[in-house]
Amino acid sequence: MQQRRSVRRALLSVSDKAGIVEFAQALSARGVELLSTGGTARLLAEKGLPVTEVSDYTGFPEMMDGRVKTLHPKVHGGILGRRGQDDGIMEQHGIAPIDMVVVNLYPFAETVAHVGCSLEDAVENIDIGGPTMVRSAAKNHKDVAIVVKSSDYDAIINEMDANEGSLLLETRFDLAIKAFEHTAAYDSMIANYFGSMVPAYHGESKEAAGRFPRTLNLNFIKKQDMRYGENSHQQAAFYIEENVKEASVATAQQVQGKALSYNNIADTDAALECVKAFSEPACVIVKHANPCGVAVSASILDAYDRAYKTDPTSAFGGIIAFNRELDAETAQAIISRQFVEVIIAPSATEEALKITAAKQNVRVLTCGQWAQRVPGLDFKRVNGGLLVQDRDLGMVSERELRVVSKRQPTEQELRDALFCWKVAKFVKSNAIVYAKENMTIGIGAGQMSRVYSAKIAGIKAADEGLEVQGSAMASDAFFPFRDGIDAAAAVGVSCVIQPGGSIRDDEVIAAADEHGIAMIFTDMRHFRH
């Protein structure tokens, strides 16, 4: 596949003009003739580059407010013409070969993201000529290079310099794949946008349209292949979204350690998303996608120390997430105390990285600071289908809570209740979390019976010698019977926070009153499966 093709003529037509002037200058300096359209042509001419307008080349003017510019046989014949096979017909019709096409498309995604975007604005930002040229050039990659990403400009010039103005077939093939990926993603955005409008377009309520198109098209970019998946007999890869707007495991930079495994990534995501729920310095330790210790404190060192005390056994081989910079003192405490798979934080000091580097198996990730949580979609694959829902970004404030018991919670109980309510959201259902003084003291996760989750949380607290008396308990969903309250009271829980909504709420509240427990309803459930 070493077949080279010289680049003598290039057509440039871009919406995103970042780097295009420099790229065009580099091409022109290497003897490449430049064709261009509209705003791109004007920009290049203003910079003193010798550029021919496509309309001058075709003898046919741009028309219909720019809707028709490049849809012409002299353009597409020059792109699609097979060298050595179609030369005669091209010469007969005055069609010059075009060796490179540089195109990126109208900013459809950016346009429809604007609040108040009209249907007319969306329609006018559907590119027609651009994708047509992109697909034509990609189809004929044997003879033509198609460039859709400005990040490829420098590499292309370097390869031309190394090959006497030519590009290798391997490069043209790779560029063609990128082009097809580019147009596929572009068409998917358009289909998703208009697909979600179908009910409203036919006169139904605006709410009926929602955010779920009738056909869901997804585009993810492969970040890395994995050694294996959740188990060693499964193959796997990690795909990420383009232009992720929130600090995440997908955008994190690995600054130390061996390659992340499938389970590392899944657990790191669980830990990071949980720690992002807290504004105070916080530490979350996760094992098998469940928090096994969470704490907030004045420093991340103390937060880590207290989170670890929740369940040291489960913390072994876990994932640790912080919402503040990893410092040397905290790094030393972790390395000295336990085996850890991954540490993730917004950043890490040089001293901290020197300490963690002493353990080659420790992976350290930095994800940057996050300003806010970004709405999006969650997916769950089922056999033959895909469940899609909004991300669970719901969280109640203190003023939204309802005290339903006779006894009001104390200020400390209220703080502990809100703390463990945040944690419970990230624990697999049925989820029960005991907390006291801003640290978890027992977590019961993933049980089929809510009362058993409550019992397990109590057992874990007892195993670690943690004082449950006067603690708060959070439940991710309502208590269907009073037995969960009785179990909590038996170990000393004094405040319960839960969604409420059971047909037996009265019995559950009565149980709380019998035990002198303060009970708070959130009116919001946080199932996690």
Curated annotation (Swiss-Prot):
PANTHER family, sorted: BIFUNCTIONAL PURINE BIOSYNTHESIS PROTEIN ATIC, BIFUNCTIONAL PURINE BIOSYNTHESIS PROTEIN PURH
Statement: the UniProt record of this protein carries the keyword Hydrolase: yes
Catalytic reactions of this protein: (6R)-10-formyltetrahydrofolate + 5-amino-1-(5-phospho-beta-D-ribosyl)imidazole-4-carboxamide = 5-formamido-1-(5-phospho-D-ribosyl)imidazole-4-carboxamide + (6S)-5,6,7,8-tetrahydrofolate; IMP + H2O = 5-formamido-1-(5-phospho-D-ribosyl)imidazole-4-carboxamide
UniProt keyword Disulfide bond present: no
Cellular component per GO, a single term: cytosol
Organism: Salmonella arizonae (strain ATCC BAA-731 / CDC346-86 / RSK2980)
Record-linked Gene3D superfamilies: 3.40.140.20, Methylglyoxal synthase-like domain
Pathway listed: Purine metabolism; IMP biosynthesis via de novo pathway; 5-formamido-1-(5-phospho-D-ribosyl)imidazole-4-carboxamide from 5-amino-1-(5-phospho-D-ribosyl)imidazole-4-carboxamide (10-formyl THF route): step 1/1; Purine metabolism; IMP biosynthesis via de novo pathway; IMP from 5-formamido-1-(5-phospho-D-ribosyl)imidazole-4-carboxamide: step 1/1
InterPro entries on file: AICAR_Tfase_dup_dom_sf, Cytidine_deaminase-like, MGS-like_dom, MGS-like_dom_sf, PurH-like
SMART domains associated with the record: AICARFT_IMPCHas, MGS
UniProt EC number: 2.1.2.3, 3.5.4.10
Pfam families tied to this protein: AICARFT_IMPCHas, MGS
Keywords for this protein: Hydrolase, Multifunctional enzyme, Purine biosynthesis, Transferase
GO biological process: 'de novo' IMP biosynthetic process
HAMAP family reported in the protein's UniProt record: PurH
Protein name listed in UniProt: Bifunctional purine biosynthesis protein PurH
Positions of the MGS-like domain: 1-148
GO molecular function: IMP cyclohydrolase activity; phosphoribosylaminoimidazolecarboxamide formyltransferase activity
Family: Belongs to the PurH family.
UniProt comment concerning the protein's domains: The IMP cyclohydrolase activity resides in the N-terminal region.
